[in-house]
Amino acid sequence: MIRKGSFLLALCLLFSTAAAQTGSFKGPLALQLYSMREELRKDVPGTLAKVKAMGFRNVEMGGYYGLTPQQFRAELDRAGLKAVSMHADFNLLDKDIDRVIGEAKIFEVKYVGCAWIPHGKDFTPADVTRSAEVFNRAAVKLQAAGFRFMYHIHGYEFIKDGDGTLFDRLVAATSQAPVWFENDIFWTTHGGADPAKLLEKYPQRFRLLHLKDMKKGTVGNLTGQAPDVTSVALGTGQVDVRGVLIAARKIGIEWYIIEEESPEPLINVPAGKKYLEKIKY
């Protein structure tokens, strides 16, 4: 006969083991404000209030929508939102890093990133060499000012390059400077790579994650471009979001950032946030 105490102990062990095998999303979570670009163009204060009402406290900057950096910072403060990262134009990083640093100071972000490397029809090894020079130089100056530099993947970097890809070449070319990476799981998938495996391959280089799903049936390419309608609510598309979250937790991703490129962010952003609140992994 099994004693009551032994049975209860076994039951507790069973549940504790199950709990150890699964977990809920803990974040920290932010919203890339580019998701709300059309709304922000019409009404910055009202849109930021909606973002706060969705339950967000943190955001990633994606432009100023007709305001100065100082004015936009004031609107964030009024809405009760904090910018944790921002994107800067490649040419500004190359030609006017002091301006970028000045704007980063206004928003008091930790990360300053670049989301697009100018290039011709195809991304080339020469583009990697040039961008690595710009990124390395910018990263050193940003670090001296108290910030971290990161590059946001956009899909075109996965063109084959020997036994690897041009992304591998970019990682290697920026290994001596403090250059970090932001894995956009939509664009990584669209470019033919596996976002979870990429995190596992470079666990020391990824610090931010763009959570974005891709419409089922979408065929990717290496252009870094896709129709906005191929961006769908998180958890409803073809990206293995759960697998990405498992890999991200293992390597210690600092920020999980929802981004929507769809024409329905007021529907898809809350739906994606709700998905994260319910998922177990």
Which residues make up each language-model segment?
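Hydrophobic faces of well-ordered beta-strands that scaffold small-molecule active sites
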Residues: G27-Q32, V59-M61, A83-A88, V112-C114, ...
